[in-house]
């Protein structure tokens, strides 16, 4: 009911489309690395932040695409059946939570700024008639959850990879099978 009520208001009162949400979704995540490069004190170094960002992004991509193509909710503008959840909002809140986790001890305003940008991204998705309010609300929670899960997974993985007494090796190597190419990672646990 709330989805349709807000959707009706958007269609009735929207003056013009604003496409900046295609870019603002990335601002919080990029800010994590940019602040580190500028020397702002964070919880992890640049390499660790990059790994955390990659892990968060992987969890986000798997969960968003899994849900989009399972639920198949029609977008409010009727263009496609991949409305739920909002991927833009999920990515924005994933980055905002990364900002919060990395810089909350330096200044809580850094994380708050990330959340303001993420919330604005979600609001623009509704305003631009791309998503229902429920898609955006769920996407926000999912983005935060993916980042929190990445932090939980990172600590044990990091300990195993940096065990000084271990003679195990981790290897990254390219592969090509005649049709597909990519990188493979071998981790000895």
Stretches with model-predicted labels:
Residues 1-32, 66-77:
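N-terminal transmembrane-helix/juxtamembrane module of multi-pass inner/ER membrane proteins
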Residues 9-19, 42-45, 85, 102-106:
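Juxtamembrane loop-transmembrane helix junctions in multi-pass integral membrane proteins
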Residues 21-28, 57, 110, 114-117:
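Hydrophobic alpha-helical transmembrane segments of polytopic
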Residues 25, 48-53, 111, 136:
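Residue-level signature of transmembrane alpha-helical entry/exit and packing/kink sites
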Residues 28-33, 94-98:
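Hydrophobic cores of alpha-helical transmembrane segments in multi-pass inner/ER membrane proteins
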Residues 31-38, 121-124:
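Residue-level signal for alpha-helical transmembrane segments in multi-pass membrane proteins
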Residues 39-60:
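Interfacial segments of alpha-helical transmembrane regions
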